[in-house]
Amino acid sequence: MSVQVAAPGSAGLGPERLSPEELVRQTRQVVQGLEALRAEHHGLAGHLAEALAGQGPAAGLEMLEEKQQVVSHSLEAIELGLGEAQVLLALSAHVGALEAEKQRLRSQARRLAQENVWLREELEETQRRLRASEESVAQLEEEKRHLEFLGQLRQYDPPAESQQSESPPRRDSLASLFPSEEEERKGPEAAGAAAAQQGGYEIPARLRTLHNLVIQYAGQGRYEVAVPLCRQALEDLERSSGHCHPDVATMLNILALVYRDQNKYKEATDLLHDALQIREQTLGPEHPAVAATLNNLAVLYGKRGRYREAEPLCQRALEIREKVLGADHPDVAKQLNNLALLCQNQGKFEDVERHYARALSIYEALGGPHDPNVAKTKNNLASAYLKQNKYQQAEELYKEILHKEDLPAPLGAPNTGTAGDAEQALRRSSSLSKIRESIRRGSEKLVSRLRGEAAAGAAGMKRAMSLNTLNVDAPRAPGTQFPSWHLDKAPRTLSASTQDLSPH
């Protein structure tokens, strides 16, 4: 119910709408006025009733009755007005109560909304912690699995007594922890004999003797003696045979090896470029010795981190060896291994997997699934998988390598082999024990990556004993053990036994 009143002095300006408080105040004033008016009318009605009761029949009686009726109507109107005013006041009180309740509910809604925001934030934080916990649990389970795998490797460890009796490892210029099978059974004399034929031309006996001396001095770290020896021999060869002679190229290659073992990669690279030019001119661009020199150059470029320049050299060496030796020759597999390592350092993992798969098929076809070269190739491929975070594939390869059929019997187990197999079994046990050490390092890297730790890259050690082999690229006789290559640490570089960085 609303009441419109005209404000004083606002005639002709339209009605003014009162506020609820003003309306209630004026209504109460009206109620007071009506109550006073009702009291007056009750008094007036009483006087009229007394007058009518004491008045006899006369002309004034009719007028009194008429006045009494008017007063009665006024009283009814006053009572009606009072009733409406009371209803208006009650309605106003009810509206006020509703408004107060509305404000209270709004305040409660705001408080609940704020609490809802807090609860939502707490829920998000709880969900985040839950996800982190689930990831941590998954990581710990994976880590536990690989630690169990590392524990299984320990059953093949030699006893502590034999470990203590072994001579301490050399801290010289060896670049790899895994010498090839060929180098393990060759001494300097055997190496010199193997170098008697060098890509179809005869190496003089004096050059072979000099080569053996260089091996000896380089193995002792006496480079101040080895380098002048090489340079003097190189000058003598150039005076006697001229610069463009295969013997000069061989001597350049030997000197490059010495510089490489001193980490003088630039000088070694320059010498190998010279040797490559001589061999291409004297032996032809598709001679196995040219392929070996190309491979050696690729190795040196790889050691200097220039993988993009090394890759085409390695690819050309592969093409020459495929053409000359055949696509299934072990030297082709070695070259594929080097090419895979170069691609791996450039992040070309599809090419890496393809090259390793082909090398693996060559070694399996030549030596069967138990050939140590097969295990080493699988280890290289597993390392590539680790770099791609393909932990499952890497672990499967490691387990294949460590399968019981591929491993020698643990130390202390009964020996059922014949006496004639003892030397070969010993070499095989030594080689596979080194593979196990490489696998253990790979698994430790895997666990470290799961823990978010960066695997510390070991400082590369040079390899003077690689001077011990003058690689012969002619086809090998059936049954000859093919040279194996080395498995190295991250960051991965071309290993010494795959480098063919020899004086051919």
From Swiss-Prot:
Coiled coil: 90-150
Keyword Cytoplasm carried by entry: yes
Disordered: annotated segments: 153-197, 411-438, 472-504
GO biological process entries: axo-dendritic transport; microtubule-based movement; sperm mitochondrial sheath assembly; spermatid development; spermatogenesis
TPR repeats: 207-240, 249-282, 291-324, 333-366, 375-408
Ranges of compositional bias, category Low complexity: 158-167
SMART domains named among the record's database cross-references: TPR
Molecular functions per Gene Ontology: kinesin binding; microtubule binding
Similarity-based family: Belongs to the kinesin light chain family.
Protein name (database record): Kinesin light chain 3
Lineage: Eukaryota, Metazoa, Chordata, Craniata, Vertebrata
